[in-house]
Amino acid sequence: MLTSNLGYPRIGENREWKKALESFWANDTTEEQLLATMKELRLNHLRVQQEQEVDLIPVGDFTLYDHVLDMAVMFGIIPKRFLQQGDTPTLSTYFAMARGSKNAQACEMTKWYNTNYHYIVPELHDAAPRLTKNAPLEAYLEAKNELGIDGKPVILGPYSFVKLAKGYEEDKLQETIQSLLPLYIQVIQELVDAGARSIQVDEPSLVTSISAREMALVTRIYEQINEAIADAPLFLQTYFDAVTFYEEVVSLPVKGIGLDFVHGGAKNLEALRTFGFPEDKVLAAGIIDGRNIWISNLRERHELVHQLEQHVAKDRLVLQPSCSLLHVPVTTKREEKLDPTLLGVLAFANEKLTELHTLKQLAAGNEAEVKEALEANDDALAALEKSGWRSGAATSHNLENKKRPQSFNERRPLQEEKWQLPLLPTTTIGSFPQTKDVRRTRSLWRKGELSTVEYERTMKSYIEKWINIQEELGLDVLVHGEFERNDMVEFFGEKLDGFAFTANGWVQSYGSRCVKPPIIYGNVSFTEPMTVAETVYAQSLTDKPVKGMLTGPVTILNWSFVRDDLPLTVIAHQIAEALTHEVTALEEAGIEMIQIDEPAIREGLPLKAEDQQEYLDWAVSAFRASCAHVKATTQIHTHMCYSEFHEMIEAIDDLDADVISIETSRSHGEMISAFEKTTYEKGIGLGVYDIHSPRVPSEEEMLNVIRRALTVLPASLFWVNPDCGLKTRAEKETVAALKNMVAAARAAREELKTKA
């Protein structure tokens, strides 16, 4: 029996990866220095896995930005706006696709399945695939030559790669995949020729609700690869849920099949018991949760391994995490400030690999060798049970299915009379640039090196500065800027009971953007007002409305590491109940325009269609519960980003927010197209420019977005706003972009007057 890993966190123990990238983008380091740092990190990650005694160590999972972007560039799938014809892609090309450039809009970015990782969407229209290099081969040879590691190259499989892309017609799916197949065959053949004995081909899309026709297409794809390269050592890897067509998947002509026995594990286990497993294949079993940070109950996991052994011989069983460890932090070893009981039940990437080794030893009958580890595991779980953190009432049942007593059509005239806003009102999503000074002020205060009085005075100065800037720009609805917030989830978690925070528990969200998710370890409850002071101060500086800014219950849930002993709906409603108190406090303080952000509501959507309605029901219920009690004149806003929202437009409508803003610009008009087929009759803002790129769009460019949106949405309900918060942008580009945005809105108003 062997152990395997599917992928390792890229960012480094101290976010060295992030720092190297941002230093390069700021022109503080050269390309050579960047590549040298990245190589050092890459090799170090391999050494760590080698020290953890992982038998099959992944290579090629490391990236300079995103692994899907890597595949697109490797296959020459580079939109024409980034390349002159015949050009070879450079590092500049690569980063321009991810981040945009002065002359070209960045490629779209969206969620990686139902996670908080974002990938760059390949654009297949007009693509002429060609192999620009064999990146998995380079990674394999580097590991072999530098460290003597016979690694397991990782490749995103052809079916999933195309399904994650855009710019192809569904009825031409087979033709599109066929155009890439010769390149896949060449990459795999060169790996085999170089001596690779295991090649991981990721096909996570096989756990979604694929059709029988598409499953037949997948079968044909792998038959063609097998015909071209007999006995290629392919491990077809799935994760995040159970496979939809178990019998067909395990019958594919590959050496091994990777199944997730954590997420969707019950269905995979049931299928294994019902249909068995081919005697000529290896089962790579995901038995350690790669997406959450709790230790495994090693005795329960050992029992699962024992159950698997009833159907698969030991020498054909590989133990591994349920998915890439990209989704968890690197190690707990620097978490010195956490409660010892809580720390004892946490396992990040390195600790999960240790658990794998322990389970391998147990399966081999070497219990004496891991006796100490088993006892420590027992003691840690017992201490958690004894702590009492998870006992007591879970949530108020009367919160479920609550809604505002008045319909939107009843509220709308009351709100219009109260707020007296112009047509196409302009606003921002919430945050303004967090400069080095802002971050330094927060850091000094947290360390106790700055008094609370001085900290609050400084924060007020930032708020006053940006209220003045917003008024000078002519924005209609203002925000206080969120300078006191390091992270939109962490900020609230720190002020609610039931949350804990790591010192170094960073994970990659997109590009160099890392987040430090809070840990929900116990029952969540309200303690005191969290946002009232800053918002009320901002409102005192202006006659224009200032929005209160909250993070919604579903986003707090989806962007946290969540306790594993309660249904998610219960935890979501606990958070909603806490937020009702904050909404009430804002309203009582005179803040009657309140934004409850739900950027992560889409990413929690289950991957199988049959499981989605249940999730949407409780997600909508939790959001509505947080604000169902407000006055009819109080205007509730929400914001969402990076998602295929046309899939869930009914649920968005059911949220019953008075105004919703949605990320639009990176989808290059596709979000607007979705409204051609769907009627939406509440306030809505489709982001008119991409805030994830340093590029400043022109007034005309944003005006064109507004014009296009107004062909499918009524002007009387349309708002003008950026795609997302402006926290990560520089001040100069932020002011320039907002100036153009306000000018575009005013120009659009004039055009509407002329038409009228």
From Swiss-Prot:
Residues noted as binding 5-methyltetrahydropteroyltri-L-glutamate in the record, renumbered to the chain: R15, E16, W17, K18, K111, R513, C514, W559, E603
GO MF annotation list: 5-methyltetrahydropteroyltriglutamate-homocysteine S-methyltransferase activity; zinc ion binding
UniProt key word Metal-binding: yes
Record: active site: H692
Residues binding L-homocysteine, per UniProt: I429, G430, S431, E482, D597
EC top class named in words: transferase
Binding site for L-methionine: I429, G430, S431, E482, D597
InterPro entries, sorted: Cbl-indep_Met_Synth_N (IPR013215), Cobalamin-indep_Met_synthase (IPR006276), Met_Synth_C/arc (IPR002629), UROD/MetE-like_sf (IPR038071)
Pathway listed: Amino-acid biosynthesis; L-methionine biosynthesis via de novo pathway; L-methionine from L-homocysteine (MetE route): step 1/1
Domain of life: Bacteria
Keyword presence, Transcription: no
Transmembrane segments: none
NCBIfam families assigned to the protein according to its UniProt record, in alphabetical order: met_syn_B12ind, PRK05222.1
Task performed by this protein: Catalyzes the transfer of a methyl group from 5-methyltetrahydrofolate to homocysteine resulting in methionine formation.
Protein name (record): 5-methyltetrahydropteroyltriglutamate--homocysteine methyltransferase
Organism this protein belongs to: Halalkalibacterium halodurans (strain ATCC BAA-125 / DSM 18197 / FERM 7344 / JCM 9153 / C-125)
Taxonomy of the source species: Bacteria, Bacillati, Bacillota, Bacilli, Bacillales
